[in-house]
């Protein structure tokens, strides 16, 4: 059931220091399981990449919550790619074929994303909305 076109919502909060600790402990093995090449390239060009990784981690969690599946059996970390508009800087997500098929089975639509981070926390909010009809 949707409310005025909303199919699902998801929010996630990540402590940036925990992300830094995970990256320091497990390195590329951890990063490669969670983040795609373009996400890694974007984060690594930043002065404190773990803050940007934390925000993208939060987006992936929030998307899985909006879909009502969590991450695991139905969609994985690499099925959700966080993108950034080159002109506006606005975040968006690109879903893999597998995640797109899941979304289609559950009502289609599109995913809207907002993310932010401070020195201590990264937060993401996702709203999964039905496609507009003419």
Question: Where are these predicted regions, by residue range?
Answer:
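Core catalytic alpha/beta fold that binds nucleotide/phospho-ligands
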Residues: 1-134
